[in-house]
Amino acid sequence: IYLLNASILNGIFAVLTYKLFLEFELDKKSSFFYTICVAILAYPSSGTPFVDHHSTFFSIISIYLLIFAIKKEKLVYWILLPFLLCFAFLSKQVPATYIFFSVIFLIIYNFIFRDEKKITNKKIFYTLFFSSSIIIILLLVFFSFSGIDIQSFIDQYINYPREIGQNRYLNLNYNFKKIIIDFKFIHLIFILLIIANINNLIKEKKFLKK
């Protein structure tokens, strides 16, 4: 059952990743290759995804859905978005909370600057409100049948993790080795990506001038 759970979750993640690459007009062969790489990287070494993996998968999928919702302008993606964010938060609060606020910021930014074509901002807002209301109702029903007190849920999922995070933050020791040396390969990849993006911007500016 655990392996089946891992396979299904990773399979859904891989399919949506492939769909995302195609959405950005990457050719099918490259999309398939990169999707295989993502699927191999995403599959946990233990074979069974822990709460961290579930929260990360659901958080990334919610970002995918936001991209699809903005590009395709279909309400089904806006309906599913709150559910994925909820699944991510219930799996583990971090990184779900960071992704949640990032998604909220992007939605507000999209509302301000988007051109209302197929779907109006009002319809999107009502859709998100309706979907979020369903989630809250389902959670309350689940709490009622399971005999879970709402305050206990708040303590376990919000107050307790916040106290742990606060203690860890206060005990952090910032130094050059921990920030730079221990993560040198990650920083190297970031530098290469920045150089590649700057190079692309320069090429685009030259192309536009022509």
Give residue ranges: language-model regions.
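Membrane-lumen/periplasm interface segments of specific transmembrane helices
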Residues: F125-Y169, D182-F185
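Membrane-interface alpha helices of multi-pass inner-membrane proteins
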Residues: A39, Y43, Y77-P95, I99-I104
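Short acidic/glycine- and proline-prone juxtamembrane loop motifs at membrane-interface regions
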Residues: A6, S45-T56
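Hydrophobic core segments of transmembrane alpha-helices in multi-pass, intramembrane catalytic enzymes
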Residues: N10-A14, D52-Y64, Y98-S102, L106, ...
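Membrane-interface transmembrane helices that cradle and orient dolichyl/undecaprenyl
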Residues: L22-K28, S62-I79, A88, I112-E116, ...
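Alpha-helical transmembrane segments at the extracellular/periplasmic loop-to-helix junctions
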Residues: I135-I136, Y174-K210
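Perimembrane helix-loop-helix junctions
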Residues: Y98-I134, N200-L208
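Transmembrane-helix signature of polytopic, membrane-embedded enzymes
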Residues: I8-I40, V76
